[in-house]
Amino acid sequence: NSAILDYQVITNERMPNIMIYLSSFKLSDRKVNNPNIYPYNVFRGKYIEPFVFTPITVFYGSNGSGKSTLLNIIANCLQLKGKEYATSNSYGIVDYCGSFSNECSYGLGEDDFGKEIRNIPSNSRYIKSEDILYEIKKIQQKQVLSDGMEYDCVKNGMSLSEAKKYLDSKEGKRQEEYIKFAQEKYSNGETSLQYYEEYLQPDALYLLDEPEVSLSPANQVLLADEINKLARLLQCQFIIATHSPFMLGTLNAKIYNLDTNEYDT
């Protein structure tokens, strides 16, 4: 853990054109009687001060440290696309997850004129590793490409006859070749990286949960480089849960170690 503590915080002076949308976040400090109630039990016994965010902030920790839970709580508080709603018990009688989220607090950043931002950008989102795996699985499980394209056309408002006519057209054939090319890219192990490249757009806050999943070490470094560029030049902010040494060694980030009781940086 000592190596993690040696990472330096990148200051605003070294990162021109940066944007901080979420400046701080404080977890609920309410004590509940039952030590097993989720998500209170995840952070029980921790000395919790507000997390203070930089353009790139990393939650580092082993499995069970609470890094994914923390990201999801932030996503719920901010109502980000991709947030997951969890229940605390098998009966759902008491909404402990909702209560916990309501007891959290956060601060927003400032705009170029020094005024507090009123809203998180609407294109911000919470991207989980299972989201990526689901997209890959969709590509793998299309049994017949033309059937999949026909289904997509009908789903987008075409009649069945219009869909068939479109797929027989020159444009439809071109689209089919494009999708085949995309599937071939997956066979080379690049679809995961391509997914991130398509979804990570300028001027947004992104919460990434274990983005290293399904990426080779080389592609993890490429993704980390892209994140650095988006944060430095294109006014993106990232909060990332990871334990990948390749990403930790490449990201220009402030790192919180969630394996300690005091959440060291």
State where each predicted segment sits.
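N-terminal pre-Walker A segment at the start of P-loop NTPase domains
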Residues: P16-I48
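N-terminal amphipathic/basic-hydrophobic helices that include classical n-h-c signal peptides
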Residues: N1-N17
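ABC ATPase nucleotide-binding domain signature region
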Residues: T69-Y151
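Short, flexible loop/turn elements at secondary-structure junctions
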Residues: D29, P55-T57, D131
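Conserved ABC ATPase signature
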Residues: Y126-S129, V144-L160, K165-L222
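ABC ATPase nucleotide-binding domain
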Residues: P50-V52
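Catalytic phosphate/metal-binding cores of nucleic-acid and nucleotide-processing enzymes, i.e., regions
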Residues: T57-Y60, Y85, G92-D95, K170-R174, ...
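Switch/communication elements of ASCE P-loop NTPase nucleotide-binding domains
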Residues: Y7, N41, I56-L78, L193-T265
